[in-house]
Amino acid sequence: MDKLLDRFFNYVSFDTQAKANVKSVPSTQGQRKLAQALQQELLTLGFSHVTLSDHGCVMATLPANVSWPVPTIGFIAHLDTSPDFSGKNVNPQIVENYRGGDIALGIGDEVLSPVMFPVLHQLLGHTLITTDGKTLLGADDKAGIAEIITAMVRLKHRNVPHGDIRIAFTPDEEVGKGAQFFNVAEFDAQWAYTVDGGGIGELEFENFNAASVAIKIVGNNVHPGSAKGVMVNALSLATRYHQELPVDETPECTEGYDGFYHLQSIKGTVERAEMHYIVRDFNRDSFEARKKNMVDIAKRVGKGLHRDCYIEIVIDDSYYNMREQIIKHPHIIELAQQAMLDCDITPIMKPIRGGTDGAQLSFKGLPCPNIFTGGYNYHGKHEFITLEGMEKAVAVIMRISELTAKRAKEL
């Protein structure tokens, strides 16, 4: 079996499911166990400057093998899997030379069907790695880890010219904390790529601007039989608030570069209600306008209330569109595009309707677009990846490294 697959199967055997609303990083012990295993593997493979931080971030260096100065670049993947679905006792299935039709996932009724997932029609003849229908696969992002390490080993063994390359494996990306304790100064790269995308050719450097919005509504409860002019129903105010937002600017009505408002939770009584929203937009001005709109609605709905009744709104920015940072360094994208073309891959540029560690790192001074892993249907039992896609990702990582060295020699 290919060493790339060996590595991947080893990593998915670790249960690294992240846990939301946990203060510690990493949020689960399984992530630390995988980090320790990777630290040991990297030392055994002869990497230099191998470190493991208190927060479970592994870093290492593949030293340059050329005599001329080359910018230090980096490749980053994450240790954790989604909190949305179990990552315990992952049992991958290999489907060689896929011939079309449904793929049975383990023993039972679960199938991976081209009717539900038409991308399978494009993968005839490929080797697919699927789940057994009971867990997610963990290609997001253990495929990225396997691809990065395999690419580094091949660069070294094949003596492909390259500068210093830094690699890092981070915890808790799935719960938004991956970049929180990432030491950019210690990583010491001029730019990097997260290997955390989907199908072959994906190259992403645009993501949402993101904010979370918490709304607290305090009403006044009295006996409904004598409530006229006295009762203030917090639930009614919550309903009025939500109805003020545009009905067609929600996740289920938007795509591409559209932004949205998303009500994630609502709970309450007559006396008190709480609402939690997220706000997303690619354009910074539109993003700011959305947040202002939410404040303005709170003012309108809360106007004229008794002084003991009120609407309180707290808005926290989560992350911003990394495009603002990356367009200042166009060669980072150009190198990745050229690397893909050199590997007979058509780059697919599309916005990320979400966020990545790279978005936060880009604003910490480490420009960091995202490249593909070769995986599909993340965060659930229908997750799968192709061996061909994984090999292509390895080839692109190697080619980016080589082109960076060539570019430095020519400058």
From Swiss-Prot:
Q: Which InterPro entries match?
A: ArgE/DapE_CS, Bact_exopeptidase_dim_dom, Peptidase_M20, Peptidase_M20_dimer, Peptidase_M20B
For the biological process aspect of GO, one term held by this record is: proteolysis
Keyword rRNA processing: yes or no? no
Q: Where in the cell is it found?
A: Cytoplasm
Q: Which residues bind Zn(2+) 1?
A: 78, 140, 196
One term under GO cellular component: cytosol
Q: Provide the alphabetized UniProt keywords.
A: Aminopeptidase, Cytoplasm, Hydrolase, Metal-binding, Metalloprotease, Protease, Zinc
- Free-text cofactor note: Binds 2 Zn(2+) ions per subunit.
Q: Which cofactor does it need?
A: Zn(2+)
Q: Which reaction does it catalyse?
A: Release of the N-terminal residue from a tripeptide
Q: EC number(s) for this protein?
A: 3.4.11.4
Provide a Gene Ontology MF annotation, just one.
zinc ion binding
The top EC class, named as a word, is hydrolase
- Annotated residues that bind Zn(2+) 2 are located at 140, 174, 379
- The entry's active site is 80, 173
Pfam (any one): M20_dimer
Family, as annotated:
Belongs to the peptidase M20B family.
> What is the recorded function of this protein according to its Swiss-Prot or TrEMBL entry?
Cleaves the N-terminal amino acid of tripeptides.
Name of protein: Peptidase T
